[in-house]
From Swiss-Prot:
GO CC terms, sorted: plasma membrane
Family: Belongs to the UPF0754 family.
Transmembrane segments: 8-28, 390-410
Protein name: UPF0754 membrane protein Synpcc7942_1098
Topology in membrane: Multi-pass membrane protein
Annotated compartments: Cell inner membrane
Organism name: Synechococcus elongatus (strain ATCC 33912 / PCC 7942 / FACHB-805)
Matching Pfam families: DUF445
UniProt KW keywords: Cell inner membrane, Cell membrane, Membrane, Transmembrane, Transmembrane helix
Amino acid sequence: MDGRTLGLWLLPPVVGGIIGYFTNDLAIRMLFRPYRPVVIGGWQLPFTPGLIPANQGRLARRIADAILGSLLTPDALHDLARRLLELPRLEAAIAWLVSLLLERLREVRDPRSIEVAADVLRDLAGSALPRWLRAIVRQRQGLDAQIDRWFEQQLLSQKLGPLQAQQLGDWLLEGAFPPDQIRRVMLDFLTDDNIRNLDRIVRDRTRGTDWVIANLFGVQSSLQRLRQFLREQPEAGDAVIAELSQRLALRQQLSQALQTFQLTDLPQTTLTDLRLQLRQGLRQWLDQDGLSLLEGALGGLDWTAAARALLDRLRTAVISDEAIAAFSHEVALILDQRLEHELEDLVAAALPILALEDLIIGRVEATPAADLEAAIQGIVRSELQAIVNIGGVLGVLLGCVQSLINVWSLST
C-alpha cells in the first residue's frame, strides 16, 4: 500500500475526529466572539459583535422568564420560605435576638437611652396591647376556652378562709338581710291565706299530745298576733329578731357553712348557667369597657420610671439559657401558627418587593461576555464532556465512511 492510499484511509478519520471534537468549543466561541463590534472605515463588519453579546439584553429577559416560570415559581418560593422558617430555625433566631437584646440593654445607662426605652415601651404598649385585646375579643372560641379553664381549675376549687367567711357572713346579716329586712319578709309571708294553710298543715301532721294542742288551740291566732306585733312595733320586732339571731348564733353558723361551701356543691345545671353567664359577662365587659380601662391604665403610667426599673432589673437579673429557650419556643410556636395561615400571602406580597425578574436581568446584563463564555465553557468541560467525546467519535466514523467512499471511487 503506497502513501497515497494510506492517506486516503487515514486522513479523513483523523480530520473528522479533530473537527468533531473541537466543534462545540468552536461553536461556543463563535456565539460570543468578537465581544465588541468591529468597525473598519466607519463600516461595521457583519456578525460583530458575537450573537450573544449583541442580544445580551434579550437573552437576559429569556433567562429571567425561564427561571421564574419553571424554577422560582410562587409555589417553589413558598416551599423554600417554609423550609427556611421551620420551627427550630425560628427558635434559634429568636433566642439569638433575645440574647443580643439583653446584652445591649445591660449596657444602657445614660438618661437619653432611658427616655428612648420609655418611648418604645409607651408606643409598644399603646399599639400592641389594645390590638391584642381586640384580637382576644374577636377570637370567641379561644376566649371561651380560657374562661372555662379558669372557671374549672380556679373558681370551682376555691374555698373561703375564716376571715373571708366571717366578713361575708357579717355582710349577709347586716347588709343583705338586716333585722328590718327579715321583719318585712315575715310580714309579706304572714298573709291570711298563708296563716290558714300553716294552721291546717300543723293540725294534719301533728301526732300525740301535739295533735291535741294543735287541734284545740291551733297556730292561727299566734301567727296573727305575731304579724300584728311586727307591724305595729317595728323597732321592737327588729330588736327581737336581732336577739334571736344572736341567741341562735347565726353569725357563727353562717361563717362555718361558708367555709365549707364550694361551687361544686351546686347542681350541674346551675354550674352550667353560671359558666355561660360568666362567659357572656366577661366578653361583654372586655368589648365595652376593657379598651377604655386599658387606655386609662396605660395613660397613668410613669413610663420613664417603668423603663428605668425594667433596665435595672435586666441589668441585675440572671436569665438562664433555659429561660431564653423556653421563651423562644413559645414565641416560635405563635409565629409558626400564624405563618401556617399567612405565609402564602406574605410570599405573594414579597415577590413584587424582591423584583426577582429585574434582579436576574440586571445581573445577566452586567456580566461581561467573556465571563459568560468562560462559565459556559467550564460547564461543557465539566458536565458535558461526553457530548464532546461523542462529537469526536462521530467525526471519526464519518471520516471512515469518507475513506471508504474515496477508495471505492479510485477502484472504479
